[in-house]
C-alpha cells in the first residue's frame, strides 16, 4: 500500500493554507505602537482622574437604591441562577449514577432539622415565583401597560409580595397536609 497519493493531497492542502495565511497577514491592518490623538487624550484623562483619587467608573453605592433597578437586577440574577442550576443539575443527574428521587431521599435521610429544610425550600421557590411573576410584568411593559412610575412601583411591590406568599405556600402547604393527615381520627 502506497502513501504517495495521500501525501500529495496533504501537501497540496497545506500549500493552500499557507497561501491563505500569508494573504491574511499581508492584508490585515498593522498594529502600531504609536497611539492616536484620542487614545493619548483618553489615557491622560484617566491618569488625571486617578491622581485626584476618583474612581474610573461610578459605583452602585453612590446611587440611592431604587425599586426599578433593584427588581430588574433581581430578575436578571434569578434568571441566571435558575439557568445555572438547571444546567448543573441536568448535567449532574445525567452523569451521576443517581436520580432526583434518590437524591431527595438522601437529603431526607440526613435528619436535617425542618427549619433548615424549609428555609432552603423557600430559597429555591422564591426565585422561581419571582422570575415568573416579574416576567409577566415585563410582558405588560412590552405592551406599554403600566409604564408610569407609580404603576412600576406598585407592580414591583406586588410581584415581590406575591412571590413571597407563593414561596411561603409552597413551603408550608405540604407540612400542613402532613399535619392534617396525622391528626385525622382513624375509624376502626
UniProtKB/Swiss-Prot annotation:
Identification of the protein by name: Succinate dehydrogenase [ubiquinone] cytochrome b large subunit, mitochondrial
Subunit structure: Component of the mitochondrial electron transport chain complex II composed of four subunits: a flavoprotein (Fp), an iron-sulfur protein (Ip), and a large cytochrome b (CybL) subunit and a small cytochrome b (CybS) subunit. There are 2 developmental stage-specific forms of complex II which have the Ip and CybL subunits in common. Complex II from the free-living larvae (aerobic environment) acts as a succinate dehydrogenase and is composed of the common subunit Ip and CybL and the stage specific subunits FpL and CybSL.
Residues in the Mitochondrial intermembrane compartment per record: 96-113, 177-188
Mitochondrial matrix side: 32-69, 141-153
Domain of life: Eukaryota
Organism in which the protein naturally occurs: Ascaris suum (Pig roundworm)
Cysteine disulfide partners in this protein: none
Membrane topology of this protein: Multi-pass membrane protein
SUPFAM superfamilies, sorted: Fumarate reductase respiratory complex transmembrane subunits (SSF81343)
Entry's Gene Ontology cellular component terms: mitochondrial inner membrane; mitochondrial membrane; respiratory chain complex II (succinate dehydrogenase)
Residues bound to a ubiquinone: 72, 76
Lineage, top ranks: Eukaryota, Metazoa, Ecdysozoa, Nematoda, Chromadorea
Originating gene: SDHC
